[in-house]
A protein has these predicted regions:
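Transmembrane beta-barrel strands of outer-membrane/channel proteins
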Residues: 31-35, 96, 105-109, 169-175, ...
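Repeated loop/turn-to-beta-strand initiation elements of outer-membrane beta-barrel proteins
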Residues: 100-103, 162, 237-241
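Hydrophobic, lipid-facing positions within transmembrane beta-strands of outer-membrane proteins
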Residues: 88-92, 148-152, 223-229, 288-292
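Short, contiguous, well-ordered secondary-structure segments
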Residues: 21, 145-172, 245, 298
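Outer-membrane beta-barrel "beta-signal"
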Residues: 26-30, 284-298
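Residue-level signature of outer-membrane beta-barrel architecture
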Residues: 96-98, 156-158, 231-233, 296
Length: 298
């Protein structure tokens, strides 16, 4: 696993920093601002919903169900594949400089705007059957992904510390707390004649035009690593201005269970004594970041 290798590398380099410390070591504080670009993001949804026939709010008499509703069905599942995102970020770091090697603790904030809409891919048989006749539209939307992260970074500086230009590379491990605005919409056919879920025309009419809508702010914590490279320019004895490029990669994160805002145009329940809740999980997610940094040695 890449994350494990990075953790081991940071640990080894950190021990080297400590063992190589001398009276000439310098403390520093660094502030940065920049932009980020993220690759496509995939979100996976799942809930404990029953089929429309088993919804006792829609079908209180249990008509046309046979034995279909005798036991709880497997969880439904779906996926939305969204496009690329971009945004901005800011950071604050404190560190120690032991000549060629630096050890640093960094805080990062980022906001990545996707503002994208994606058709919903369905993977369970019950929902697939409804997609062929009952469900007219199914899509997901996401807005901004915002996160607060913390990293332990180790850098290697090339060239003497008194040089005007100092290129460097680095690696870091840490984690973030991410928040994602997610919306899921399932719209049923307005025309009852196109719905074959029920034979009864009154039940068809009751289902027609109903919607299932979820509006969630999905939050989760996850671990990750980053690879860094950049160059600093010495402005004076204690100040440096630099440009830094980073690739940050985080593991998947999962939000908690959330009630649907409405389920088939009624409350998030099927009248069976439990709420219907859904969860959203992302694939591994990451981003490229490019920033300008101001460093002060003290």
């Amino acid at each position: 696993m890449m994350l494990r290798r990075v953790v081991l590398a940071v640990g080894a380099m950190s021990m080297g920093c400590v063992s190589g410390a001398s009276a000439q070591s310098n403390r520093y504080i660094e502030m940065g601002l920049g932009v980020n670009a993220a690759p496509p993001l995939v979100a996976h949804g799942s809930d404990n919903d029953w089929s429309t026939k088993c919804d006792l709010i829609i079908n209180p008499l249990g008509l046309e169900t046979g034995g279909e509703c005798d036991s709880a069905p497997p969880r439904t599942s779906w996926t939305n594949a969204f496009g690329r995102g971009n945004g901005f970020g800011a950071g604050l770091a404190i560190g120690y400089d032991w000549g060629a090697v630096r050890l640093e603790l960094e805080y990062l904030y980022r906001s990545t705007a996707y503002d994208d809409r994606s058709d919903t891919d369905i993977f369970d048989d019950v929902t697939l059957d409804k997609r062929e006749q009952e469900i007219e539209q199914a899509y997901g939307e996401i807005d901004d992904l915002r996160s607060h992260g913390a990293f332990v970074n180790v850098y290697y500086d090339f060239g003497p510390s008194i040089a005007s230009w100092t290129p460097y590379v680095g690696v870091g491990v840490g984690g973030e707390r991410a928040t994602l605005d997610y919306r899921s919409v399932w719209k049923r056919n307005d025309d009852p004649e196109r719905i074959s879920t029920f034979m009864d025309p009154l039940l068809r009419a009751k289902v027609a035009g109903t919607t299932t809508i979820g509006n969630a702010r999905v939050s989760g914590s996850t671990l990750g690593y980053q690879l860094l490279a950049g160059v600093d320019y010495r402005l004076g004895e204690r100040a440096m201005l630099g440009v830094k490029l980073r690739w940050v990669d985080f593991e998947a994160f999962e939000g908690g269970e959330t009630l649907w805002s409405q389920l088939r145009s009624h409350e998030s329940s099927v009248g069976r004594g439990e709420d219907i809740r859904y969860t959203v999980t992302t694939d591994d997610n990451g981003y490229w970041g490019l920033g300008v940094n101001l460093k002060y040695l003290f």
